[in-house]
């Protein structure tokens, strides 16, 4: 499998400053055939207590996996700077998960002294996790079990959750030949690629000004991945280019406005300097 992030999770922690819990968890999610969760320590963990926000990615139910299991993954954890994307804190790494190694992440993800530098806005801290599975040892049937428990439904040859039926039906209605070249027969792989496609279409339905450069870069990677799998996505590629162009125009306008603001400030200082001299 190529080094691609298969799933992107956004976790908004509300009322961060008033949290009393030592540790907080994000809802369990599935990537590949494995359940994962995010674990955060708002006041730090280990040597970082009262110093840093600690953040980890972990396997919550190792007993559900077969004997000898192992998962080799690539992941990126980001604490988003909501004022300036470039100042966001990231942990990018590969990790080998197995029974005696169930978590990866960082004890020093974000110094607490930096919270008010754009990371804590309106009482909220925003975390983004991106995960891709590179190698699987000991297959799990968690995805098939999840579909069974939730009443998996066959839509155009893909097993989907009831909550996804409308979106998938609309996708095939608007683009009837979208899967005409899709040849994978494995149920898990078919569902994984379709989920990636649904996430991509949902992302590109957002207003361009809400999308970061990281969002667009990940969208390009996902589009390449699902296209190689056999989906016909010329229309989506066009949409992504349009969104990228709009985003670029917005950035250029923001830069222009900033330059004009700086020029006005400089003129005001010159006027003040002249008035003081007179």
Curated annotation (Swiss-Prot):
It comes from the Eukaryota. Pfam families: MATH_2 (PF22486). Residues 232-267 form a coiled coil. Keywords: Coiled coil. InterPro entries: MATH-CC_domain_protein (IPR050804), MATH/TRAF_dom (IPR002083), TRAF-like (IPR008974). Signal peptide: none annotated. SMART domains: MATH. PROSITE patterns: MATH. Residues 6-131 form the MATH domain. PANTHER family: TRAF-LIKE FAMILY PROTEIN-RELATED, TRAF-LIKE SUPERFAMILY PROTEIN. This is MATH domain and coiled-coil domain-containing protein At1g31400. It comes from Arabidopsis thaliana. The lineage of its organism: Eukaryota, Viridiplantae, Streptophyta, Embryophyta, Tracheophyta.
């Amino acid at each position: 499998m190529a080094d691609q992030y298969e799933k992107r999770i956004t976790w908004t922690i509300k009322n961060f400053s008033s949290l009393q819990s030592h540790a907080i968890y994000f809802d369990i999610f599935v990537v590949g055939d494995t359940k994962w969760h995010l674990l955060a320590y708002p006041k730090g963990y280990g040597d970082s207590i009262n110093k840093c926000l600690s953040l980890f990615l972990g396997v919550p139910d190792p007993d559900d996996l077969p004997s000898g299991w192992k998962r080799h993954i690539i992941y990126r954890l980001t604490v988003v700077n909501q004022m300036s994307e470039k100042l966001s804190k990231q942990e990018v790494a590969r990790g080998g998960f197995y029974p005696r190694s169930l978590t990866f992440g960082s004890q020093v993800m974000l110094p607490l002294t930096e919270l008010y530098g754009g990371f804590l806005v309106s009482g909220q801290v925003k975390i983004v996790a991106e995960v891709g599975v590179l190698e699987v040892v000991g297959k799990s049937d968690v995805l098939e079990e999840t579909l069974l428990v939730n009443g998996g439904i066959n839509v155009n040859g893909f097993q989907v959750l009831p909550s996804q039926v409308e979106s998938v039906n609309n996708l095939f209605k608007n683009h009837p030949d979208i899967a005409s070249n899709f040849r994978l027969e494995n149920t898990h792989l078919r569902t994984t690629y379709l989920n990636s496609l649904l996430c991509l279409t949902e992302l590109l339905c957002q207003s361009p000004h809400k999308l970061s450069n990281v969002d667009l870069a990940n969208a390009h990677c996902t589009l390449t991945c699902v296209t190689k799998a056999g989906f016909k996505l010329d229309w989506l590629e066009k949409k992504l280019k349009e969104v990228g162009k709009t985003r670029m125009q917005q950035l250029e306008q923001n830069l222009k406005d900033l330059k004009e603001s700086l020029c006005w400030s400089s003129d005001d200082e010159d006027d003040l300097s002249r008035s003081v001299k007179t």
